[in-house]
């Protein structure tokens, strides 16, 4: 009987866990849908800014601006700024592992070349994975649970802009997971600085600039950096929720399979007990 009690307790426990994983799956699905909508709404703006930057590069307009040269030209022998986007919470499969693995590989390559490195880490999981080995490289760390997206984007942008203005960085790269679908997230390494020239110069014909110089370049650079961070953040959030939804769906299905096996085992144990009791009753009646 104690065995039956243990089985019933375990079944109850697994069912309770299954309810939690199912609820988390539904919450992540809802969040993912909302973020996908935000991505769709922001894509036009981000693409427009990127095309304008490519147009400026194509006609060498940035050479008219001292500020522009800081953002479009490589500054040799300065810091390599790596911005690492991870999640604040776990239970999302290999979502963070792929990012951390790539960052560690790139840091190793930069160290072998004798390059200077600085890290801006977004998300608790990335910080926990990198702080022990690369604490001396960490410039800033942002907890996603303690800061709004707008403020996060602004602060990261200010750090990038300040470093570029002061000629402190050779390049700036951002790591994030690009959303494809709920089951597929693509680890992405995207260069922010220096701004790369587009292979397609056809966009140049679409723009007519009313004025030139510092004001245009400065405003456009600020918008560009802001849009790149916003894009990476939205993609990473959608990927995180997709990964978590898939992980929780798998956990829910595994719990269902385990419950079926435990119920079968419970029924067999009950059947064995009943059969034993019947045999004892029959044996007792025959003895009388």
From Swiss-Prot:
GO terms for cellular component: plasma membrane; proton-transporting ATP synthase complex. It is found in: Cell inner membrane. It is a peripheral membrane protein. Its main location: membrane. Pfam families: ATP-synt. One of its GO terms (biological process) is proton motive force-driven plasma membrane ATP synthesis. GO terms for molecular function: ATP binding; proton-transporting ATP synthase activity, rotational mechanism. It comes from the Bacteria. Keywords: ATP synthesis, Cell inner membrane, Cell membrane, CF(1), Hydrogen ion transport, Ion transport, Membrane, Transport. The keyword Hydrolase does not apply. Produces ATP from ADP in the presence of a proton gradient across the membrane. The gamma chain is believed to be important in regulating ATPase activity and the flow of protons through the CF(0) complex. F-type ATPases have 2 components, CF(1) - the catalytic core - and CF(0) - the membrane proton channel. CF(1) has five subunits: alpha(3), beta(3), gamma(1), delta(1), epsilon(1). CF(0) has three main subunits: a, b and c. HAMAP family: ATP_synth_gamma_bact (MF_00815). Belongs to the ATPase gamma chain family. This is ATP synthase gamma chain. The lineage of its organism: Bacteria, Pseudomonadati, Pseudomonadota, Alphaproteobacteria, Rickettsiales.
